[in-house]
Amino acid sequence: MLPFCDKMEKKRTEGYAMKQTKIGLVTVGHYIYFEQFEGLFEELSRKGEAFAALLREEDCEICNAGYIDRPEDAFTAVRALKREDIDLLFIVLSTYVPSAVCAPFAKYLDVSQILIGIQPLEHLDYSHATTYMQLCNDDVCAMPEVAGVYRRLGKSIPPCIIASASMEGYIRSQVREWIAAARAMAAFKYETIGYLGHTYEGMYDMNTDPTAFTAAFGAHVKMLEICELSRLAEEVTEEETKRKIAHVRNIFEICDPSIDPLTDFVKDEDLALSARISVALKRLVEQNGLCALAYYYKSEKNNPYEPLSANLIIGNTLLTSSGIPLAGEADLKTAAAMLIMKALGGGGSFAEIHPFDTESNVVLVGHDGPHHIGISDGKPRLRKLKKYHGKSGSGIGVEFSLRSGPITMLSISVDENGKMQMIAAEGESLPGEIPQTGNTNTRVSFGCPIHEFLCRWCEAGPTHHFALGIGHHIAALRKFSVISGISLIEVK
């Protein structure tokens, strides 16, 4: 059967198109059986059709190579799948299949592959069992042989999904997690991440080798200059600024000063400056074709770039919330973590550890920006800050908590061998008071004494920044680790 590609309608995030993940599918069998058992081909083919229907429920584009039962047909399917440039391949074993039928996929397709063995029956009807019935339920018979041939061909043994058809919930969750992991990897494919400025002075954990980053994730790291952003800001018209101000007023609650003496009233000119820079920042991203941006500009006092670099928070928050993650202090690795979290459906805000609360057994996590307002608990607030602690200039900060419920923290750091590694933990966002300091803060519990969790987290070697997202995503991150080859440390 000749391959074809099922073009599904592309879904979009607010503001920016989500790149569609291409999922390959092939169903394999043994042609000799079909000469011996009438109707068996049709019955086994339906297994691939059923799996394709399952894939259509997910946000992906399906490239279905059909039913393959000879090595020669596998060669044809491989060439077609290579043309489609798929991100992941599911191989449905419909019955016993000689490993020669699967070997071409192992040898010639440089993409993660998953072996599927879904047995129709929970058990054979032993008193009425026939050879035909056994062949219809021999989905796992060849799996050891097929898995072994990957190793003999110098490839990693593929992960396997083995279940009876009645285990529908398990099958769906496994498929969904693998597709989410493939989507996270595809988020970097043929993409460009911007790097504006330099890392915050002295933050060794922020320093990243751009070539090592490309080796790990695939995306190109493009060096940008603050003067380009300055030029774009000068080109913003008064009408564009007014429209952005109206947009900001619609999204945010503008707050008066709090008890913190660093807070101040948000004046019209403050809002106008942030709005103008927001328009320019969006244009910078679009003109350079960026999927994410890491930025930091120290700025000398009263330098003409100081107001520009100090008033990025509204713009970077709007971009992050629309699907283009921005990471402050030029944290390239956390920009990647935010992009992964976005692809997994968790949103992804820029965060670090703030003070903990032993009485409530929570830790506050947040930052002065950038943030993802799509996962906030209620309307986000704006506060004017007379100064940023540790940074130059003054400007408007964003303040909110993540909505209550499950959360995931994802940090990406570098190990002693210079390799990227992920550190992740799952917790719970809880309601309650947060400081009114123009920063985000979320009260997070981890189901154990908070000081013990923090010890384990710090001892795992993360960067001090991380992506904070809603939902529990470690199961999908495990699969992303398999696909990407980036190790994962789970902190519990």
Which residues does each predicted region cover?
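Cap/lid and interdomain-hinge subdomains that line or gate substrate/regulatory clefts
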Residues: 20-23, 59, 122-259
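Long, internal scaffold/assembly segments composed of regular secondary structure
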Residues: 242-335, 342-343
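Extended hydrophobic packing segments that form well-structured cores
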Residues: 389-492
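Short, positively charged and aromatic/hydrophobic N-terminal segments
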Residues: 3-10, 14
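C-terminal catalytic subdomain
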Residues: 318-435
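Short, acidic/small-residue loops that bind anionic groups at enzyme active sites
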Residues: 104-129, 134-142, 316-329
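Periplasmic-binding protein-like
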Residues: 86-95, 114-116, 291-295
